[in-house]
Amino acid sequence: MKSVDLKILDARMREYLPAYATPGSAGLDLRACTEASLVIEPGQTVLVPTGLAIHIGDPRYAAMILPRSGLGHKHGIVLGNLVGLIDSDYQGQLMVSTWNRGTQPFTLDPMERLAQLVIVPVQQVAFNVVEDFDASERGAGGFGSTGRA
């Protein structure tokens, strides 16, 4: 398996290096690399630095920033862009677009776990204009066509 080199921008992160929690974990926790607590008001979206920069450097891979389920379910804290896609040639700091969709202000403390980083394989495609498609059982059916609508 290819290893991705994570570069650290903030020296405080030495004590908070991302790690897989279990052998079956897919995601690495990203933390709020802030100097002070940050209050996110209901409906507000803020960019939160993670202190981490990555350069995957291999177009067969990308990274995805995903929300932590507990923050979304219990506090309404989700990603402002729903999913963050990090291309293999990006080299900057990872920032988390953080949206409070809840009804109460949320205080995000320094180094609090905020999101998850997952490395995924990528298959780039080539488009080919055709006259029609080969027939399939499903056809053009969508939006509930294979089950309960």
Curated annotation (Swiss-Prot):
Pathway: Pyrimidine metabolism; dUMP biosynthesis; dUMP from dCTP (dUTP route): step 2/2. GO terms for biological process: dUMP biosynthetic process; dUTP catabolic process. Pfam families: dUTPase. Substrate binds at residues 68-70, 81, 85-87, 95. SUPFAM superfamilies: dUTPase-like. It catalyses: dUTP + H2O = dUMP + diphosphate + H(+). Belongs to the dUTPase family. This enzyme is involved in nucleotide metabolism: it produces dUMP, the immediate precursor of thymidine nucleotides and it decreases the intracellular concentration of dUTP so that uracil cannot be incorporated into DNA. This is Deoxyuridine 5'-triphosphate nucleotidohydrolase. It comes from Bordetella parapertussis (strain 12822 / ATCC BAA-587 / NCTC 13253).
